[in-house]
Every structure is written in C-alpha cells, then in structure tokens.
Amino acid sequence: RSRGLGDVYKRQLYCKAMKIAKEKGISVFAHCEDITMVEGGVMNADENAVRLGLKGITNSVEDVIVARDILLAKETGVRLHLCHCSTADSVEMIRLAKEEGLPVTGEVCPHHFILTADDILEDDGNYKMNPPLRGKKDVEALRQGLADGTMDVISTDHAPHSEEEKNRSMAKAAFGIVGLETSAALTYTELVKTGILSVMQMAEKMSYNPAQILGLSDKGAVAEGKTADLVIFDPNPTYTIDKNTFVSKGKNTPFHGRTVTGEVRFTLVDGKVVYEK
C-alpha cells in the first residue's frame, strides 16, 4: 500500500515538474519504463525468454509510460523527448501526437532497429540492455518511423561496462551496450545502403535534429558561425566490427564480428582533430 501511495506521489511530482519545465522553457527527456511492471525481467517477454529460462519484460512496460507522458505533455504544453524507444506502439503513439500538433519527439538506437530477441541465441550478458531487444514487428515499425519522420533522432544509449559486469548470465549482468564507435557504420549499413534513409537524413537524425531538440543553435550543421564539431565519414570501407579495437574501455557490444560498411575517419571538436583513423 505504501509503495502505491509513493507511486501516486511521484506521478503528481512528475506532472508538477512538467508544468515548471514548460514555464521555464525547458524540455523533458523521458526514459519510458514502468519499473513496477519489470519484476526482475532481463529481456523481451517472448518465446526466447522461455527458451533461455529468463524473466521477460513486456512491451507494455514502455508503452504505458509513453502514453502517460504524451498525455501530460498535452496537458502542460511542455516539449517532450522520448528516449530510446523500442516498441511499435511507442512509434504509433508518437505519430498520433505529432498529427495532433503536440511538441513531442522520439529517438531510436541502432540495436533496436537492427536486432531482435531472436538474435539472442544463448544466455549472453552482452545482449542485456534497457529497453530490451524486441520483436520483428517492432523493428519494422522503428524503421518505418525513421523513414517517415515520426522518429526524429538516432542515438546510442551508450552505456559502457567492464567485462566483469557483462561477461556473465543475463540475470546477473549489468544492463547496457556501447554505441559511440559503431552507430555511424551500423546506421549507414542498415538504413542508408538499404534505401530507408538518405545520407542527409542520416546526418539530420544523428546531428542536426538532436542539436535542435537540445536547443544548441551553434551545433548540428556545417555552416558559417557554427561550432566545428564534426566527423568525416568514409562510406567506402567494408570491415568486421572488432570490439578489441575500440578506443573505449567498454567493449560490451552484441555487434562484435558483424560486417558493416563505412567508418568515421576523423573527429573534430571545436575545429581541432581529436580522433583520426
């Protein structure tokens, strides 16, 4: 009973925070997960979880919070950004919110628009992430949402962990996946080469749109007066992702051994080269 009252209080506090954010001109970024429904789940609730003997996380864990937050955004008028969406229903709710003219934006990560729970062949902690990998219909909806403009941003949800934290069963491993060093190549390979997005749309969703949503007027585009935070991307090389070559100390990726095309050759921060391939 006390937990239930606490949840009500939190919802009231969240609504109040949204109203204040609206007054202050601040956007709300939401990780959509009803933690009261997770119940120890570690992967998508489907036949794969049953096969591996693991507790599942249903799509509704995400969907009910997406619905709640969109309704509160409608009530308060606050700008709402929904982070790392993973379900078909989340995409549809964002689409309907936009059709209604609500200030709602959404993002997708490469692991969610590429992999499904069917790719988890064994109990491997590198496939444990939050939200979890979903089903094929969810992947199709996420890709369609990116193609038709419903989903505004491609992000990484970059969450590095040590090998000790990830090289264990999914029930014991930490949630999270690294993405900074693979996102560009994965997006180019899976979305641009397949004709789902153009190169310019890829740049918009990975750079321009995020800057606009964050209110960073001096970033996100190549133009006079903008900060020279840039990457130079070579679309030609084809290679196999090798986690052992990552600059990051975090090697936790399910994409190790996957063949991709395209790589970041240079990274510039404020006009200075900070990375060179």
Where are these regions (language model features)?
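Short, acidic/turn-prone active-site loops that include or flank metal/cofactor-
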Residues: 6, 109-111, 177
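Short, small-residue-biased leader/transition segments that mark boundaries at the very start
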Residues: 2-9
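Histidine/acidic residue-rich metal-binding segments in metalloenzymes
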Residues: 10-154
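Glycine/Thr-rich phosphate-binding loops of Rossmann-like dinucleotide-binding domains
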Residues: 38, 91, 114, 162-164, ...
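Short, glycine/acidic-enriched loop or turn micro-motifs at the edges of active sites
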Residues: 34, 87, 110, 160, ...
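Short acidic-hydrophobic sequence patches enriched in Asp/Glu that either
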Residues: 13, 179-183, 247
